[in-house]
Amino acid sequence: MMSKLGVLLTICLLLFPLTAVSLDGDQPADLPELRAQDFAPERSPWFDPVRRCCSQDCRVCIPCCPY
């Protein structure tokens, strides 16, 4: 029974390696279009200089202020 379990585990690891699991869930999303434009949030009309974040339209302006 244990050898069957070992074979099954080996097959599963070969078909779905642990490196395929993304472990960077706490990282912010990569926005290449903003990086390519040399985006500076300080020049955005939604940027709040006091809080150092964007108050509106978080799709365009980063970092977004918490509510």
Swiss-Prot record:
Q: Which cysteines are joined by disulfide bonds?
A: C53-C65, C54-C61, C58-C64
Q: In which tissues is it expressed?
A: Expressed by the venom duct.
Domain of life of the source = Eukaryota
Propiece span(s): 23-50
Is Disulfide bond tagged as a keyword? yes
Compartments annotated for it: namely: Secreted
Q: Per UniProt, which keywords does this protein have?
A: Cleavage on pair of basic residues, Disulfide bond, Hydroxylation, Neurotoxin, Secreted, Signal, Toxin
Q: Name one GO molecular function term.
A: ion channel inhibitor activity
GO CC annotation: what is one? extracellular region
Q: What Pfam families is this protein classified in? A: Conotoxin (PF02950)
**Family, as annotated:** Belongs to the conotoxin M superfamily.
Please quote what the entry notes about the protein's domains: The cysteine framework is III (CC-C-C-CC). Classified in the M-2 branch, since 2 residues stand between the fourth and the fifth cysteine residues.
Question: What's the protein name?
Answer: Conotoxin TsMMSK-B022
Q: Which organism is it from?
A: Conus tessulatus
